């Protein structure tokens, strides 16, 4: 996998590689995510988006998007991460590459407030439409009738 990662670093000079316990993590700026994911899917055989999630790091003022990709034919796995500004978390939608990203992006939007430009129907999926806030953010406080 070393040659593979070196090739990606040549194509994406801002790419940071972090060794993981199980698989390497590629950290890429948000504006390069779509190009990297297109490369991984169309030219490198990572044909399956296993999952995506968001992690809140309020102490660092960031939200980290985490994507797990599998190459079913190549029996390989890779992790891609994107650090977002916590006040305005936004990263391109991957629904054009993987239609299954639709529901997972809606969940990250609903629960963490991440916006996905290019998403075909970005709206809440678990919370009511009139719900205020994003309940998986670490600073979220549930408001009850009559106070806290």
Swiss-Prot record:
Q: Which InterPro entries match?
A: NADH_DH_suC, NADH_quin_OxRdtase_su_C/D-like, NADH_UbQ_OxRdtase_30kDa_su, NADH_UbQ_OxRdtase_CS
Q: What is its main location?
A: membrane
Which PROSITE patterns does the UniProt record give?
COMPLEX1_30K (PS00542)
Gene3D superfamilies with a match to the protein in the record = NADH:ubiquinone oxidoreductase, 30kDa subunit
- Location relative to the cell: Cell membrane
Is Transit peptide a UniProt keyword of this protein? Answer: no
Under which EC number(s) is this enzyme classified? 7.1.1.-
Asked whether the UniProt record includes Oxidoreductase among its keywords, one would answer: no
Q: Which GO terms describe its cellular component?
A: plasma membrane
Q: Please give, as recorded in its UniProt entry, the membrane topology of this protein.
A: Peripheral membrane protein
Which protein family is named in the record?
A: Belongs to the complex I 30 kDa subunit family.
Q: What does this protein do?
A: NDH-1 shuttles electrons from NADH, via FMN and iron-sulfur (Fe-S) centers, to quinones in the respiratory chain. The immediate electron acceptor for the enzyme in this species is believed to be a menaquinone. Couples the redox reaction to proton translocation (for every two electrons transferred, four hydrogen ions are translocated across the cytoplasmic membrane), and thus conserves the redox energy in a proton gradient.
Q: How does it assemble?
A: NDH-1 is composed of 14 different subunits. Subunits NuoB, C, D, E, F, and G constitute the peripheral sector of the complex.
- Protein known as: NADH-quinone oxidoreductase subunit C
The organism encoding this protein is: Moorella thermoacetica (strain ATCC 39073 / JCM 9320)
* Phylogenetic placement of the source organism: Bacteria, Bacillati, Bacillota, Clostridia, Moorellales
